[in-house]
Amino acid sequence: LRVIHTPGHSAGHIALFAERQGVLFAGDTCANMFGLGPSIMYEDAAEGMGSLARLATLDFEAVCFGHGRAITRDAAGRFRRRWAGGI
């Protein structure tokens, strides 16, 4: 299990990446409540967007969130399309 520092929601926020299983646990880095989007609350929005761009570089099959339904199909592709440019 790989621990990834993902500041933004909070300064000490982390995501967990189970590489062998292809699962990213994004926590509160982002949400999937009304479609894939950034977290509802960020202490630092710029840091949060940077964290999302970094997560978009990973290869995973599924992603789980602190809020909203998991994405189990094309999860990494959806992240890349949404945040690869840090947008």
Regions found by a protein language model. Give the residues of each.
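Metallo-beta-lactamase
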Residues: 2-82
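Acidic/His-rich, metal-assisted hydrolase cores and their charged scaffolds
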Residues: 84-87
